[in-house]
Amino acid sequence: SEMCIRDRYASEFELTNDLNNLISSYSHGMKQKLVIISAFVHSPKLLILDEPFVGLDPKATYLVKKAMVEFCENGGAIFFSTHVLEVAEKLCNKLAIIKNGKLLITGKMEEVIKDSTLEDVFMELTNNE
């Protein structure tokens, strides 16, 4: 149930004791955790997340990555934006690189990076932009 999912993530993200507090009293990181929990609570098929790791401490970042992988392994899909290329390279099986509203490349991760790294591909694509 939604309450079970909420309680599970609240416990994992160490927010259980704060759930009855006003959100305005939350730190930026706590608000970010709450947004992530609210995205998962209804068990959607698709999540669209904008910079989901901004403001998170290392433990919360790890937990979000773990939750994202579990979500996808259970048939869900996630579109997320990030400026941290290592995270995208590790988590994503498909990607799109967009610069100034222009789609520079899209495809399966292994086809895009080949024997390189995502950072190298990004720098090559955006060097003359």
Regions flagged by a language model, labelled:
Residues 3-5:
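Short, small-residue-biased leader/transition segments that mark boundaries at the very start
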Residues 106-107:
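ABC ATPase "signature
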Residues 58-60:
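Helix N-cap at the start of a conserved alpha-helix in ABC-type nucleotide-binding domains
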Residues 88-90:
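A short, surface-exposed alpha-helical micro-motif characterized by mixed small hydrophobic
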Residues 47-51:
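Catalytic Walker B motif of ABC-type/P-loop ATPase nucleotide-binding domains
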Residues 62-74:
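Helical segment within the ABC ATPase nucleotide-binding domain
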